């Protein structure tokens, strides 16, 4: 499991990156979600890595 937290605002970013944040379930700064570690989730994380913080959750 991965614990993903949004640490930067999506204002002014590329619309595709905003959609990726929505796809991950993130809506605002400080919001945290838990996701299963899959290749598709990893790809989404790599796209918006500059706006999120990722920690491994056991």
From Swiss-Prot:
Keywords: Ribonucleoprotein, Ribosomal protein. GO terms for molecular function: structural constituent of ribosome. The keyword Ribosomal protein applies. GO terms for biological process: translation. Pfam families: Ribosomal_L30 (PF00327). The keyword Ribosomal protein applies. GO terms for cellular component: cytosolic large ribosomal subunit. PROSITE patterns: RIBOSOMAL_L30. Belongs to the universal ribosomal protein uL30 family. Part of the 50S ribosomal subunit. HAMAP family: Ribosomal_uL30_B. This is Large ribosomal subunit protein uL30. It comes from Blochmanniella floridana.
């Amino acid at each position: 499991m991965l614990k993903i937290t949004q640490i930067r605002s999506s204002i002014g970013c590329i619309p595709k990156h905003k959609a990726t944040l929505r796809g991950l379930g993130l809506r605002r700064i400080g919001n945290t979600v838990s996701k299963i570690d899959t290749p598709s989730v990893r790809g989404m994380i790599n796209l918006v890595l500059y706006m999120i913080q990722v920690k491994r959750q056991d």
